[in-house]
C-alpha cells in the first residue's frame, strides 16, 4: 500500500494546481530524481523516472532506474506494473485510501481545489518565485502513512520539489526536471 500511496499523493498535488489556475498547463510532464531516506540505512536510495499528468489520461508515474515500476491512475481506475512485469489492477472500493485519492482528483479536475482541505490542513507560503504548499493529512487513511507533504513550485502547475515525511520515519524528496519540449 505504501508504494502506491506516495505516487498517488503526487497526483493530489498536480491535479488541483492544473485545475485551479488558468495559466497552469493542461499537462505536466517531467523527469524526476527520487531520494528516499530509510531508518537503518546508511545511505539514501535513489531512483529516476518520469511523471505525467493531464486531465484526459490521468496520472502516470514510472520508475526507470534502478528497477522498473509503473503506477497509473485515471477515470477507469488504477493499476501498477511491478518490477517482475506483473500487472495488478487496484479497486478503489477495496482500497479506502485510493477511493479518497480518486475523489480528490475528480473534484480537482472539476475545478474544486478546496477539496484538498477536506483531507489536508493546507498552508500556502509565497516565495520570491512561486510558492510552497504544506499539506498535513487530516485523520484518515493518508494520515496512517504520511506525516506531511511539502511542495515547492516555481510557477502554478510547475512543482520543483516534493518532500514527503512518512509515519514510518522514512523521508522522500522528489526533484522534478522539466522534460524537453
Kindly label every feature range from the protein language model.
Residues 20-37, 41-44, 81-138:
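Flexible, processing/modification-adjacent segments and terminal tails
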Residues 38-39, 67-69, 141-142:
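Short beta-strands and strand-coil junctions in structured, solvent-facing domains, enriched
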